A protein has these predicted regions:
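Catalytic His-Asp segment of secreted/periplasmic serine-dependent ester chemistry enzymes
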Residues: 7-109
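Conserved, well-ordered alpha-helix/loop/beta-strand core segments that scaffold catalytic motifs
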Residues: 2-5
Length: 109
């Protein structure tokens, strides 16, 4: 059985507020899941809550915010609000796994 998954949110803050992203894409995924009558895991909603709760500074730990010299692949540093670091990937994957369990698609551990 197919399962659809919305994208995680991006870390875009303006005036201290986390901004909505992926609106039309998320809506299209929800409509497709309804039309196909398949489960949808709303990773966007859950990741938005996680990032918002971490705050503007704290949420940097989830995304590719690297200081110069922190990672040899990015000697000058990096500021990427779309792609996750290991901590973010693990936290968002945990949330997705919880969604799969709540939807009855996989058994609880």
């Amino acid at each position: 059985m197919p399962v659809l998954l919305t994208p995680i949110c991006m870390r875009i803050w303006e005036n201290g507020m986390l901004q909505e992203t992926h609106g039309e894409y998320r809506d299209a995924m929800q409509a497709l899941a309804q039309r196909m009558e398949v489960p949808l895991i709303d990773a966007y909603r859950d990741s938005f809550r996680i990032v918002a709760a971490a705050g503007e500074e704290g949420s940097k730990a989830f995304f590719m915010h690297l200081a110069p010299g922190e990672d040899a692949r990015y000697p000058e540093g990096l500021r990427d609000n779309a792609h996750t670091r290991r901590a973010g990937a693990a936290r968002f994957a945990e949330s997705i796994a919880r969604g799969l369990i709540q939807a009855g698609l996989v058994p609880a551990p």
